[in-house]
From Swiss-Prot:
<protein>
    <recommendedName>
        <fullName>tRNA (guanine-N(7)-)-methyltransferase</fullName>
        <ecNumber>2.1.1.33</ecNumber>
    </recommendedName>
</protein>
<comment type="similarity">
    <text>Belongs to the class I-like SAM-binding methyltransferase superfamily. TrmB family.</text>
</comment>
<dbReference type="InterPro" id="IPR003358">
    <property type="entry name" value="tRNA_(Gua-N-7)_MeTrfase_Trmb"/>
</dbReference>
<comment type="pathway">
    <text>tRNA modification; N(7)-methylguanine-tRNA biosynthesis.</text>
</comment>
<dbReference type="InterPro" id="IPR029063">
    <property type="entry name" value="SAM-dependent_MTases_sf"/>
</dbReference>
<dbReference type="GO" id="GO:0008176">
    <property type="term" value="F:tRNA (guanine(46)-N7)-methyltransferase activity"/>
</dbReference>
<keyword id="KW-0808">Transferase</keyword>
<dbReference type="GO" id="GO:0043527">
    <property type="term" value="C:tRNA methyltransferase complex"/>
</dbReference>
<feature type="binding site">
    <location>
        <position position="93"/>
    </location>
    <ligand>
        <name>S-adenosyl-L-methionine</name>
    </ligand>
</feature>
<feature type="binding site">
    <location>
        <begin position="217"/>
        <end position="220"/>
    </location>
    <ligand>
        <name>substrate</name>
    </ligand>
</feature>
<keyword id="KW-0819">tRNA processing</keyword>
<feature type="binding site">
    <location>
        <position position="180"/>
    </location>
    <ligand>
        <name>substrate</name>
    </ligand>
</feature>
<feature type="binding site">
    <location>
        <position position="120"/>
    </location>
    <ligand>
        <name>S-adenosyl-L-methionine</name>
    </ligand>
</feature>
<comment type="function">
    <text>Catalyzes the formation of N(7)-methylguanine at position 46 (m7G46) in tRNA.</text>
</comment>
<feature type="active site">
    <location>
        <position position="143"/>
    </location>
</feature>
<feature type="binding site">
    <location>
        <position position="143"/>
    </location>
    <ligand>
        <name>S-adenosyl-L-methionine</name>
    </ligand>
</feature>
<dbReference type="InterPro" id="IPR055361">
    <property type="entry name" value="tRNA_methyltr_TrmB_bact"/>
</dbReference>
Length: 239
């Protein structure tokens, strides 16, 4: 059982406090997921330690690192890793059945350029991810906390943006977000436009077309069924 951190922010996006609990949202692992966790964790799983990772040691090469926060069941992350063997992919997901499903798919796909963690992403960022080291950070379909009184719980806040900025490679690292909630998309733009050291790479300074390298996720398919649009947003670290 791992610590999970829930952050609360004020209206200015500043961190007020961290609420810690020891509930991992375990869920029930299927036999296939449990088998994948047991078999694949030694080669693809990374245990939480409060010390910085060495990407060359983790992956055995110097290829660019793409990190995804909250990969769900991992299908799109595995597909991206399979389609881009010249990159390394690192996924963080707090829901263990999702990690098991991701490992099962990765094993079936025969990919070797993927590593996963089952832990709170903020703690991993604070203690394990080296500064200036990520080519891309992916945040796809995070919890929109659609009620206005809950907007302060959204992960995309100024404090989080600064943490992301520190981890991206200077002058080239990309923060790629996607959401099927228009209000959250507008919130992302508003926060990131305030965040120092970032530049929106969209031609109109708003949203980018859906990138071909981002696979269709179940959340996106759900959004289409509900009549929602999907918004992709990319910011580049420029300082």
């Amino acid at each position: 059982m791992s610590e999970v951190t829930t952050n609360e922010y004020n209206e200015d996006g500043k961190l007020i406090r961290k609420i810690r609990s020891f509930v991992r949202r375990e869920g029930r692992l299927t036999k296939g997921q449990e088998n994948a966790m047991n078999e694949c964790w030694p080669t693809m799983g990374i245990d939480y330690k409060a010390e910085l990772l060495d990407w060359k040691e983790v992956f055995g090469n110097d290829n660019p690192v793409v990190l995804e926060i909250g990969f769900g069941m991992g299908a799109s992350l595995v597909e991206m890793a399979k389609n881009a063997p010249e990159k390394n992919f690192f996924g963080i997901e707090v829901h263990s059945p999702g990690v098991g499903a991701c490992l099962s798919d990765a094993r079936e796909a025969g990919i070797t350029n993927l590593r996963v963690m089952c832990h709170d992403a903020v703690e991993v960022f604070e203690h394990m991810i080296p500064n200036d080291s990520l080519a891309t950070l992916q945040l796809f379909f995070p919890d929109p906390w659609h009620k206005k009184r809950h907007h302060k719980r959204r992960i995309v806040q100024l404090e989080f943006a600064e943490m992301v900025r520190q981890k991206l490679i200077p002058n080239e690292g990309i923060f790629h977000m996607a959401t099927d909630w228009e209000n959250y998309a507008e919130h992302m733009i508003e926060i990131m436009n305030q965040a120092p050291g970032f530049e929106n790479i969209a031609q109109d300074g708003d949203f980018v077309p859906r990138p071909e390298d981002r696979p269709l996720t179940k959340f996106e398919a759900r959004g289409h069924r509900l009549g929602h649009g999907v918004w992709d947003i990319k910011y580049k670290r420029i300082a």
